[in-house]
Amino acid sequence: MKRILSAICYLTLCCLPALAQKEHAAKGAAMTDQDFINMAAQTDMMEAHLGQMAADQASSQDVKTYAQMLVTDHTADYQQLGTLAAKAGLTVPTGLDAAHNKMIAPFEKLKGAAFDSRYVQTMIAGHTEAIGVYTKESSDAQSADVKAYATATLPTLQKHLDGAKALSKKPAK
């Protein structure tokens, strides 16, 4: 039962960006700039929080170093979103919503190699999905500024994905 619950939480976390986009596609509408800002901000806050958790709960120094990079990058990205949103007359969420807090909860119970493995696999899946969403927004966003932001953020997301994939190939310690 515990494994099933963990798998459900893992899949939910990994598929969040795609689900946000699919919800709008199902309604026949593209993701609005506000929807994209909300999704990006929630993801930034969640990844920064998970990265902070890794400082205490991960066992691998490589995972801790990677997680700190994500904390730094996603914190800076969140601040950039605030500037972008203010310029566009949009709002940025200031705290994690209930869905994102629920996605973080399973990580609170993990330590050591179990945390490392789950964290790395989650980052691979999450960044793969995020790259898809950001790529779409880089051409479909209503605002030229949002398009430019999505385009400019793609290399960082790719760096995060590449880093997580490299970690997944290292033997667990």
Language model: regions and residue ranges:
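His/Met- and acidic-residue-enriched segments that coordinate or traffic transition-metal cofactors
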Residues: 2-10, 15-173
